[in-house]
């Protein structure tokens, strides 16, 4: 059984990690241990590089905290080009897989508040009345009328980031 350290305690992210690992390695093939670690970037990262750095930092910090795991996984959400997206970073101590998620364009009224220094989650909670929306369906769930959720979009990115770990051509 793979010991997987999730560098987040966010249920939407943990669900995506668990589903993706079970899709690739089989049901019951992993045990997820969530840990809270620092990203080293602002609460609301801007730009692809800052967001990717946050995910990389979370993986590195999780490795230091739990060095005996088989995999360390981080998902960092950010804002870039008026849209929300995330970077997924997965490491197994030998190699690393990284993937960027799909992007969701955000309305100007939301972006204005985020650019003024508020994080997307609290802004979305204000507009929707859904407490801790970032730990649930997220802006993605709201603006796609539930056709996609934060977790479903993360799931795809985790699957992509896992590619180097089960395809020999990457080695």
Swiss-Prot record:
Homodimer. This is Inosine/xanthosine triphosphatase. One of its GO terms (biological process) is thiamine metabolic process. It comes from Salmonella paratyphi B (strain ATCC BAA-1250 / SPB7). InterPro entries: ITPase-like_fam (IPR029001), Non_canon_purine_NTPase (IPR002786), NTPase/PRRC1 (IPR026533), YjjX_NTPase (IPR050299). Phosphatase that hydrolyzes non-canonical purine nucleotides such as XTP and ITP to their respective diphosphate derivatives. Probably excludes non-canonical purines from DNA/RNA precursor pool, thus preventing their incorporation into DNA/RNA and avoiding chromosomal lesions. SUPFAM superfamilies: ITPase-like (SSF52972). It catalyses: XTP + H2O = XDP + phosphate + H(+); ITP + H2O = IDP + phosphate + H(+). Keywords: Hydrolase, Magnesium, Manganese, Metal-binding, Nucleotide metabolism, Nucleotide-binding. Its EC number is 3.6.1.73. Mg(2+) binds at residues 38, 68. The gene is yjjX. It comes from the Bacteria. Its cofactor is Mg(2+); Mn(2+). The keyword Magnesium applies. GO terms for molecular function: ITPase activity; metal ion binding; nucleotide binding; ribonucleoside triphosphate phosphatase activity. Belongs to the YjjX NTPase family. Substrate binds at residues 8-13. Binds 1 divalent metal cation per subunit; can use either Mg(2+) or Mn(2+).
């Amino acid at each position: 059984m793979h010991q997987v350290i999730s560098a987040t305690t966010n249920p939407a992210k943990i669900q995506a990690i668990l589903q993706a690992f079970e899709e690739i390695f089989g049901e019951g093939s992993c045990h997820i241990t969530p840990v809270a670690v620092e990203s080293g970037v602002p609460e609301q990262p801007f730009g692809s590089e800052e967001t990717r750095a946050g995910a990389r930092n979370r993986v590195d910090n999780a490795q230091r905290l739990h060095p005996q795991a088989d995999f360390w996984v981080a998902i960092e959400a950010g804002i870039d080009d008026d849209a929300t997206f995330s970077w997924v970073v997965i490491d197994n101590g030998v190699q690393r897989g990284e993937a960027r998620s799909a992007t969701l364009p955000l309305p100007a009224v939301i972006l204005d508040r985020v650019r003024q220094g508020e994080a997307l989650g609290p802004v979305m909670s204000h507009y929707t009345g859904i407490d801790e929306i970032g730990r649930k369906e997220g802006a993605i769930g709201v603006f796609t009328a539930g056709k996609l959720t934060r977790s479903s979009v993360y799931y795809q990115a985790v699957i992509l980031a896992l590619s180097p770990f089960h395809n020999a051509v990457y080695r």
